[in-house]
């Protein structure tokens, strides 16, 4: 059995009181998961700065390792750079999530960035299911998400993007969010999406982007071509949960994309959870066991 390696490093500085503290402008986290006779174990966990794994859990089966990624400062400000890398070895299965919403604050003239790189081996599975992301006024954000899958690997990736907090009366009146996502399987590019949204621009209201809504949830599943009956049921159930927003699902060969547009992060969370509960058993042959952290 390969043992867990856990390394960490950090940059500190001394404030006027002589107390050392983190400079959290850069943070990196690297994880690896390995199959050990039917049990998925985290065999690498290295971090630089305030990105960490809180704990690993097995709420459903030893074959599926749930890991909670934590960014202790609680929010990202201008100049911060987060890099997350995860590798899931052959036959292993990992689910990665976060303990709460990710918050991107005012840029102060500096770009904030997050780069996620995920690699999944043969007959392995990965679920990337962070909780919602909130962009506050004057945020300047660039997000990059790259997934590399073996020819028979399976993947579910979800995200909820909130532009402002409408429930608190906080709108996204200034700022910019750029995003790029790519998914490859067996060396072939299956999915590529990129775009940039500028607050108050026409792109925020385009039917090709947010269509005037402030919350966007996307769930992508790779690894199986769903039949027509399943897709119709998914569309009907998802639309019923949209509550005044919009919902849809599209199958492109072995890539299923489901999306919600609305004004409620709470509705988006419910929509995402239900869509995942519907898709996961079909793709992963496992019932959807909700991560415990989602209920806290």
Curated annotation (Swiss-Prot):
Q: Please list the GO terms describing molecular function.
A: nickel cation binding
Q: Which Pfam families match?
A: UreD (PF01774)
Where is it localised? Cytoplasm
Q: Tell me the keywords, alphabetical order.
A: Chaperone, Cytoplasm, Nickel insertion
* Gene Ontology CC, one term: cytoplasm
Major location category of this protein? cytoplasm
Q: Which domain of life is it from?
A: Bacteria
For this protein, the parts annotated as crossing the membrane are: none
Q: How does it assemble?
A: UreD, UreF and UreG form a complex that acts as a GTP-hydrolysis-dependent molecular chaperone, activating the urease apoprotein by helping to assemble the nickel containing metallocenter of UreC. The UreE protein probably delivers the nickel.
**Role:** Required for maturation of urease via the functional incorporation of the urease nickel metallocenter.
UniProt record similarity statement? Belongs to the UreD family.
> What is this protein called in UniProt?
Urease accessory protein UreD
Q: Which species is this UniProt entry from?
A: Janthinobacterium sp. (strain Marseille) (Minibacterium massiliensis)
Taxonomic placement: Bacteria, Pseudomonadati, Pseudomonadota, Betaproteobacteria, Burkholderiales
Gene behind the chain: ureD
